[in-house]
């Protein structure tokens, strides 16, 4: 840069700033596109970390069940006798939360509740 006059030095600095600006704009728009990509795949586990008999022991027995339903992470059960429910055993099995009313309970287990519901329905109605 020793042989360049002031006009050439200014032009080099100006072109450097323009090039840097183009790179910044390119990377910010690319990052914005990547951040707007949505995950369209729902991850549901089919691995149940306890046996079905252990679960039946926690709710009294298999015969205590009236109805079972589930969302992704919550198991909703209707029982004949709510007094047979053992909250402490359910927590040992991995329940993160338990909500009760007169005959229905909602148990938050995790992403395997849909699989657990299907197993219980197969066991009850087969």
Swiss-Prot record:
The keyword Transferase applies. Keywords: Membrane, Phosphoprotein, Phosphotransferase system, Transferase, Transmembrane, Transmembrane helix. The keyword Flavoprotein does not apply. GO terms for molecular function: protein-N(PI)-phosphohistidine-sugar phosphotransferase activity. The EIIB domain is phosphorylated by phospho-EIIA on a cysteinyl or histidyl residue, depending on the transported sugar. Then, it transfers the phosphoryl group to the sugar substrate concomitantly with the sugar uptake processed by the EIIC domain. To M.genitalium MG129 and M.pneumoniae MPN268. This is Putative phosphotransferase enzyme IIB component UU178. It comes from Ureaplasma parvum serovar 3 (strain ATCC 700970).
């Amino acid at each position: 840069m020793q042989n360049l006059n002031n006009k050439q030095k200014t032009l080099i600095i100006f072109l450097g700033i323009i090039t840097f600006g183009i790179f910044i704009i390119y990377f910010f728009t690319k990052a914005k596109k990547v951040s707007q990509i949505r995950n369209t795949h729902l991850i549901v586990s089919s691995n149940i970390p306890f046996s079905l008999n252990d679960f039946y022991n926690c709710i009294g027995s298999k015969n205590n069940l009236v109805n079972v339903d589930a969302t992704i992470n919550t198991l909703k059960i209707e029982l004949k006798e709510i007094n047979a429910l053992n909250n402490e055993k359910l927590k040992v099995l991995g329940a993160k939360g338990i909500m009760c009313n007169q005959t229905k309970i909602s148990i938050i287990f995790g992403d395997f509740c849909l699989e657990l519901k299907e197993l219980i329905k197969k066991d009850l109605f087969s």
